[in-house]
Amino acid sequence: MIMIFFGCMNLYSVSPEKAEKQLIWILLSFFFIFIIFLFKPIHYKHITPFLFLFTLFLLIGVFFFGKNVNGSKSWYVFGSISFQPSELAKISTSLMIAHIMSQENIENNNKALLHISIILVLPSFLILLQPDPGSSIVFSSFLLTLYREGLSISFILYFLFYILLFVVSINLSPWIVILLLFISFIFFFFLKKNISFLDLFFYIFLFISFSVFSFFSPFVFQKFFKQHHKDRINILFQNEFDRKYRDNVGYNLLYSKTAIGSGKFFGKGYQKGTVTKGKFVPEQHTDYIFCTVGEEWGFIGSVILIIFYLLFISRIYFLSERQKNIFGRIFGYSVGNILFIHLIINLGMVMGLFPTIGIVLPFFSYGGSSLWSFTVLLFIFIRIDASDQTSLI
């Protein structure tokens, strides 16, 4: 509630009209909370497969009936009401992961790991095709949930390395990257003693797969990424203050950093932000809402907000760990990890550490779909954590 209240305050500073609409979304979210508490936790487990299939149906249908917004065909629009099925996908996938993993242990179980992989790949791939890479990246948060349940840390490290390799390969010659990989592997062999034949075969396979991935990364980037996605990634390696970039692809990042930096230690004061008040930062009510915090509340206000988020997420992890049933624990960790990934990527976006990929700040940014999605995620978990004696159904 503190974050929602603080978010409304900052929205009002940016746009009073948006703040009034957000207040309506907040009031309507209490309806979802009421519905959630009508049901026993076991009911959510029973409807999970049907909800997941319904979500896939919506994600496929958006290609035919969806509206193109900001280059992505990811919204259903019904008059003045719009709905993004990728938000529902976060809920249904969290439930489905918990449903499957409460029945199958993924530790040393390739069959269970395959089932989980299919569940994760289907919605994230459909969302990526829209194309909405930001929402698709959020699904990587489930790797943290899988790690808690026994997934080897190697899988996560490989995933992160492939992302790093992709970014490096589109900015350097793939041949240079392959040469660096080769030198690294040779250096590793000299350090490691008594390598078995199977280990040698595995490392050679890794080198070949990394090399092939690096070689084709620039081709994939140029052919399959839309221009605005390429611009948002490329600007991370350029100087946004350069005249060549500051008036186009670097505009968002330039004024985002300017707004945050101008707040200094204590901020300019509520509703006294010159950059945000001047509406220099595009989407400052959604993706870039943190700029308002940095400018008006300064370093102190920004740190306090981040601490609130971390305490909030830590509390979710604590409640997840104390769950007596596996379903509740896994779902709780999924909720916490989704919020954590949103927080990290959103803060990284406004500070130029990540490309702008449309990731909102949970319970803070403007938007009904995202607010309702986070509300439903959180309160289903709260309902699972609470006693089921108060259920009406």
Language model feature labels by segment:
Residues 247, 254-297:
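Long extracytoplasmic/lumenal interhelical loops at the membrane interface
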Residues 346-393:
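A juxtamembrane structural motif centered on a specific transmembrane helix
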Residues 83, 255, 363-364:
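Short hydrophobic beta-strand that contains or immediately precedes a catalytic carboxylate
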Residues 2-5, 9-248, 294-351, 376, ...:
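Hydrophobic alpha-helical transmembrane segments of multi-pass inner membrane proteins, especially
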Residues 132-137, 266-273, 284-286, 357, ...:
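Transmembrane helix boundary and interhelical junction motifs in multipass membrane proteins
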Residues 291, 302, 333-334, 362, ...:
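Pore-lining and gate-forming transmembrane alpha-helices of multi-pass membrane transport proteins
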